[in-house]
């Protein structure tokens, strides 16, 4: 990567620092590798000046919670948030943020952008902002410098690296520019901030993003910012087919309530009438002429009459042959001798009938394609076990701190799948959805970390793995599958009580001890479901094979809260991580305990993560 600075061996928490990357306004980017799982990430180390501000950290924490729950190719993807030696840092995927701002990209395009090129960038930006606003995220600092362009693919892709943080950093950014006020570039940037700022007081609202979006659209079309009584695109570019006037006027409206809530629907073409008028305006008066005489359009009957005359003329030499061939087979087999008058009369009547057939106007009916009902894949259901509700003990005295204290809870009755969802079950869900992402662009499964592959556009399971539990699936994929089959994910409390099999404070699902004949752990791969004995409830693979996603957000101290509010606990109201339970095929024995808690980001992908479904009793 460009700009990397080699350094010696150095650690930041659990991450081995490989090299330093670019330094931004609010963070230092670092390429690092996790010391245990040996996977590379980009760490964003917060500046000490910001991390020491309590007001900033409070707002920053709220933004992180929102960002951690979403996945979009145009928004920074956060895997984790951590702290080491008093330093806060974000853990993001190994993808360096593009360093080419929109201003730099436009300056590199000597010929300017065509309408379609500008429309493509505008459409991407509108779609990202609509997605962010739907998830209660505001940019608050849109400008030519905050919008980045990724040129690594076949076509330019819009990326917003500061989405969620920009509004928090606006004051600091302005102060840094004022410190460098002697430079002309700093003055230009300050001017740009003011021109992209909505006229109302800055509060970090959707309306402010919409206003800045309108300014960006105007700049992409005109290569200048809208100031004063600015001209509209229809005046300068009458040949453009999209209705840019409506978009710009609605976005730049001084009345906040008149600005649109969604941006993507504004990208519409002009009507055919508007396009015709625009084309007419372009034409000079010399090119316009009035049609004084009404053109003589031949009627359909005249055309058919001419065609008929031509056919009769061309076939007159062969008419006798045609008439003989066209007669019925009964007449051809008739060997009786008729009088000459009868033959002539019959031939004349037959000729007249043929001519009337030729001059008949053809009837053309509209072709309507027969609708074929698309047959979508149906789910393969798993047998379920009924678990009667009541009072139970959960937690552990010997485990980690987040398993304390042991406390009593009450659960309603519920059903639980007897084994985790398999590859052959999950592949039907993917075929039905038609994508590896949901409608919010959340990843459902990462195929390269699973045993399901896409070959020639078709999903196939690796040979021998149809009955193995599906892996590489995110929490979103697990939750989506459960909804598809009319079920849900189990709560953490339901999962723990089910793993104990109705026995109070059972250490492992199979008893007080466990060995490799009772569960798949500390091994090299998954095994087919139901390969090991079931627990007392008749549930298989509650220990080992794959970690299983639960419905709950993870809370480190939630057991203390659950001890006070013990009625059907369902986890914290919000959080950064989702709960995982049960250990996996490469876990140590301690991870297989019924009370052991694990967690990860809901969008995290791992070859050890799977799930099973639950259902309430109505």
UniProtKB/Swiss-Prot annotation:
Q: Which reaction does it catalyse?
A: L-seryl-[protein] + ATP = O-phospho-L-seryl-[protein] + ADP + H(+); L-threonyl-[protein] + ATP = O-phospho-L-threonyl-[protein] + ADP + H(+)
Q: Which EC numbers characterise this protein's activity in its record?
A: 2.7.11.1
Residues binding ATP are: 21-29, 44
UniProt's post-translational modification comment states: Autophosphorylated on serine and threonine residues.
Task: List residues of the Protein kinase domain.
Answer: 15-381
PANTHER family per the UniProt record, alphabetical: FORMYLGLYCINE-GENERATING ENZYME, SULFATASE MODIFYING FACTOR 1, 2
Function field: Together with the serine/threonine kinase PknD, may play a role in the specific interactions with host proteins during intracellular growth.
Q: Which family does it belong to?
A: Belongs to the protein kinase superfamily. Ser/Thr protein kinase family.
Protein name, as recorded: Serine/threonine-protein kinase pkn1
Q: What is the lineage of its organism?
A: Bacteria, Pseudomonadati, Chlamydiota, Chlamydiia, Chlamydiales
């Amino acid at each position: 990567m460009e700009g990397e600075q080699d350094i010696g061996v150095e650690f930041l928490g659990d991450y081995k620092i490989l090299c330093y990357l670019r330094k931004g306004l609010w963070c230092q980017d670092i390429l690092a590798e996790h010391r245990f799982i040996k996977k590379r990430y980009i760490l964003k180390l917060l500046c000490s000046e910001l991390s020491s501000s309590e007001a900033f950290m409070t707002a920053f924490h709220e933004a992180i919670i929102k960002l951690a729950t979403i996945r979009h190719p145009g928004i920074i993807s956060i895997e984790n948030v951590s702290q080491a030696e008093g330093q806060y840092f974000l853990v993001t995927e190994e993808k360096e943020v593009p360093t080419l701002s929109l201003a730099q990209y436009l300056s590199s395009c000597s010929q300017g952008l065509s309408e379609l090129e500008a429309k493509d960038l505008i459409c991407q930006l509108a779609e990202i902002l609509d997605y962010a606003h739907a998830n209660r995220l505001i940019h608050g600092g849109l400008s030519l410098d905050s919008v980045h362009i990724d040129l690594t693919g076949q076509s330019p892709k819009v990326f917003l690296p500061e989405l969620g943080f920009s509004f928090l950093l606006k004051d600091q950014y302005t102060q840094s520019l004022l410190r460098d006020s002697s430079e002309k570039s700093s003055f230009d940037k300050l001017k740009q901030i003011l021109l992209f700022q909505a006229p109302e007081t800055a509060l970090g609202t959707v309306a402010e993003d919409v206003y800045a979006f309108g300014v960006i659209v105007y700049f992409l079309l005109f290569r200048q910012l809208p100031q004063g009584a600015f001209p509209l695109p229809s005046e300068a570019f009458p040949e453009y087919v999209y209705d840019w006037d409506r978009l710009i006027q609605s976005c730049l409206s001084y009345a906040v309530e008149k600005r649109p809530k969604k941006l993507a629907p504004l990208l519409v073409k002009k009507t055919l009438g508007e396009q015709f008028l625009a084309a007419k305006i372009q034409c000079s008066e010399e090119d316009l002429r009035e049609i004084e005489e009404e053109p003589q359009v031949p009627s359909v009957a005249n055309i058919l009459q001419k065609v008929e005359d031509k056919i009769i003329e061309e076939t007159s030499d062969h008419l006798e042959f045609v008439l003989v061939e066209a007669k019925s087979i009964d007449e051809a087999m008739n060997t009786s001798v008729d009088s000459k008058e009868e033959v002539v009369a019959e031939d004349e009547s037959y000729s007249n009938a043929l001519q009337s057939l030729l001059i008949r106007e053809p009837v053309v009916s509209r072709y309507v394609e027969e609708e074929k009902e698309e047959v979508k894949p149906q789910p393969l259901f798993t047998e379920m076990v009924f678990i009667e509700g009541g009072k139970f003990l959960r937690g552990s005295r010997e485990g980690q701190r987040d398993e304390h204290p042991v406390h009593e809870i009450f659960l309603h009755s519920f059903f639980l799948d007897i084994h985790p969802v398999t590859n052959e079950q999950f592949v039907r869900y993917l075929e039905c959805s038609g994508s590896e992402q949901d409608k919010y662009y959340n990843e459902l499964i990462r195929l390269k970390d699973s045993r399901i592959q896409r070959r020639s556009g078709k999903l196939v399971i690796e040979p021998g793995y149809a009955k193995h539990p599906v892996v590489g699936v995110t929490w979103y994929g697990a939750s989506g599958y459960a909804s598809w089959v009319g079920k849900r994910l189990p709560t953490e409390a339901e999962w723990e009580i089910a793993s104990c099999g109705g026995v109070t404070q059972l250490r492992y699902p199979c008893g007080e001890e466990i060995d490799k004949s009772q569960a798949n752990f500390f091994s090299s791969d998954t095994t087919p479901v139901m390969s090991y004995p079931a627990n007392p409830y008749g549930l298989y693979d509650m220990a080992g094979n794959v970690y299983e996603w639960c419905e709950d957000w993870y809370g480190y101290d939630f057991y203390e809260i659950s001890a006070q509010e013990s009625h059907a606990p369902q986890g914290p109201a919000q959080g950064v991580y989702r709960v995982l339970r049960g250990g996996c095929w490469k876990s140590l024995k301690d991870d297989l305990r019924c009370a052991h808690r694990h967690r990860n980001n809901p969008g995290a992908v791992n070859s050890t993560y799977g799930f099973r479904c639950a259902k309430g009793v109505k």
